């Protein structure tokens, strides 16, 4: 069998979950081979701190600046993605009415938030619009979908590129310990899944 797994925003999720940020590092612990952590045979270094596979420990009691900012952008992305999907679903409804070729006489559509799924009243109202009116509404929905997609992709790139920035010596929050903690956590997650599946 061949399987494909997509771990949603893996590195940003690791940063948030472990609270990886320069000001949250508290110290180191004795390392064990990565396989021992995957098999849960390595001793648990600390219950008080989040521990990374590269030996660094992070505070849990205070949110780090990097995880906080990633969370903000992550939720903005989710919001824009939902808007994009709403506009896309609305296009399908309009397309169905256009394909049925049974048009009404109303030539101006009601002001509606095209990012949100059309209400039942709006769905019924679609049947009363002229073809030109439906085309205009379709244009609005397509524009909203493109805007939503652009915004969610921009945020995806922003949060995913932050990991690379952490390993860049010119970045204000550069810290190789953090960059390697994220990488090793990612490797551990993939290897853990591989062992569970196999």
State each model region's role:
Residues 1-198:
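Conserved acidic
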